[in-house]
Amino acid sequence: MGRKYDFEYIIIGSGPAGTAAALTLAKSKKRIAIVESHFLGGSNINTRDIPYAASLHLSKLYHKITSSPVFQNQDISFSFPNAVSHQLKTVLKASEANKSALEKAGIVHLNGIASFIDTHTIAVSSKQLSAENFILATGSSLKISEITGTDTVSYLTPETAIKIRRSPKVALIVGGGPTGCEIAEYYANLGIKVIIMETAERLLPHEDKEVGEAISNHFTKELGIMVLPNCKVVALEQDKTSKCVIFRNSRTEKIVRVDCIVLATGSEPVLDYGLENAGIKYKNTGIVVDKNFQTSAKHIYAVGDCLGGESSTERAEYQGTLLATNLLNHSKNVPNYQGFPRTINTNPEVLTVGFTEDDLLKRDRKYKKAIIKINDIPAAKIYDSNYGFVKLISDKSNHLIGATVVAPHASLLAGELSLCIRHGVTALELASTPHATNEYNYMVKLAARKLLTK
């Protein structure tokens, strides 16, 4: 007789990947548990996507009202404590909905930090539990760069940066990636003087150059943010009145004094839970898996940000669902990431779907592109938008393979553009599809039409 396990599946981590896997596997009526050391929902619900969306919504609304010449009332003020309270209420609602879905599916919640004892056993809050199979969905955490002084000078993280209860005069954001740009947007909308530093030559270096240029122009010309590319922070110091940030630009060291420092220096996979005890191979960049998410231990799988590489909520949820479906059906369908969207919640928002132009240049792949600037459509005049564009990319036969949008509410176009790219829609088919003339999505139609002339 084989070994009897406490569960058929234990899933470590309740973020989008772990939750998707758990809810899909629950259809099998097997004994399933999910381990979470914090609130259910992972960083998506509790510290990243939802709290950021709630906070940025408020800050954009405040900035729109206070900066518009139409609204005459100058007595409007922003309450940081009330904003944090709103954010926490929003998170609680989402977390409770996640918890309710897992409970209704009969999934057991194990509260605590998991650590492997052996290949089939973990310890959770002093209890030992066994499973026939494991799914690792432990996500990622803040990566602290090699900056002298982080052990003695206080700083904010992406999690705490949007929970401040009073306004600093000057804030420095270290890191010009998506998270750093969203924090810069949040602060500047509320009247905080912001400096943002990026080691690369432009903001958002993993997007096409037009994206970084558009967001930089919005930051500097509309929000008054000081953008400092090609800068590396080397040390933090504290004096009686302020924090001192020592940074290097080319070969010159300079100092800037600020009230608040936010480290938005990227993330790294969470790997410190006894993977060696289970015989799981991993690197500093993430857990090693095959094309079906199987680790070196054949009964243990991994999905989501703990794999390293490109990450997003949509990608993690897709991986969790695909893995669980394969396990239920004893199939080996491999992931198809064609046309996956990623978004950045600045204003204008950034949406990228499928290939970027940089991706194709690196692959030495031939393509056609068309760009429509936001000023070319009526919506820009109606909604007073100055910076943005749509770029569509097709292969030689005019099938869409990539799209980049910088515009207010760009994320609303994710479904349309993802559908087009995943299902091989041509530029002609998209150009022939009616779009609302006075809305931002009209740029998509115009860009598709322009592709036909290439």
Q: Which ranges hold each PLM region?
A:
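Glycine-rich dinucleotide-binding loop and its adjacent helix/turn
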Residues: 49, 138-193, 197, 226-227, ...
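Glycine-rich flavin
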Residues: 2-7, 23-30, 35-167, 200-204, ...
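Flexible, glycine-rich terminal cap/loop adjacent to redox cofactors
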Residues: 10-38, 45, 50-51, 55-61, ...
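Short hydrophobic core segments
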Residues: 10-12, 114, 129-139, 173-174, ...
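Short glycine/serine/threonine-rich phosphate/pyrophosphate-binding segments
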Residues: 17-24, 44, 155, 180-183, ...
